[in-house]
Structure formats: C-alpha cells, structure tokens
Amino acid sequence: MAMDDKVLKKREEIQEQDKWSINEIYSNDEVWEKEYKELQEEAPKLKEFEGKLGDGETLIRYFEVNEKVSRKAEKIYVYAHLRCDEDTSNTKYQAMMNKIDAYMAEYATYTAYVVPEILSLPDGTIEKQMEELKGLEPYKFLLENILKEKPHVL
C-alpha cells in the first residue's frame, strides 16, 4: 500500500456522490440561522407550562409543543455538527456547532421542571388522566417510566 493512500483528502477532492447530502437538511446556512433564531423564540415557551402539568389537557399541550420544538432543535444540532465534521478546520462551522451546543444547555433549563413536577403530583393523578384522555396515549410509555421513579424520590 502506497503512502499516498493514507493521506486524508480535502473535501473538495472527494467525489460528490461520496459526500453527505447535508443540503437536504437545510438548503443553506441562512436557512439554518433563521431556524436557530426561531428556536430561540419558541423554546422558552416551554417554561409556560411549569406548575400546570397536573392538568391532563395542559400536559398534552406541553408534550405537543415540546415535540415540535425538540425536533427543530435536533435538526439544527445535527446540521451544525455534520457541517463541522465535513471539515473540522472550518471555523465558520466550528462556531455554528459551538453556538448550538451552548444553546442546547440553555434549552435543557426550559424543561428541567417536567419530571420533578410530574413526580410531585398526588399518587394516581397521571394514571387517571391516562385513562381519561386519549391524547396522552402517545406519551404513555414516557409517563410510565417517569412514574417508576416515584418510589425512589424523597
């Protein structure tokens, strides 16, 4: 095996069919930036549900909003990381990756109350709501896993 075979090629030297098609995630960086700004506006709204999760309809709305926002956050995160992985020396994409990484830590603070709040509800509250509200069905597994922790929480 020749020594040249072990030299890492630059991205522009790689054939197009052998590259990730990241533009299917976002057509360009400006679209990414627009969605990032939208995420910064939408994510804090998750805090509006704090103290209200004992109401089943509110819990359903929380899960729906959280799902929408978290999918957007994941898409933004993946795009930035894949762009950075294309060429780790590209400072523009390093900055994008660092930007979303830092924001994801902030994002986590908007939902940090959810599990403790659910666990603090009176026994049987969530179970009763799951029986009465079909809208909680998609979240049954998640809620049951949270409730399994209740005996271990002071």
Map each language-model feature to its residues.
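A well-structured
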Residues: M1-L154
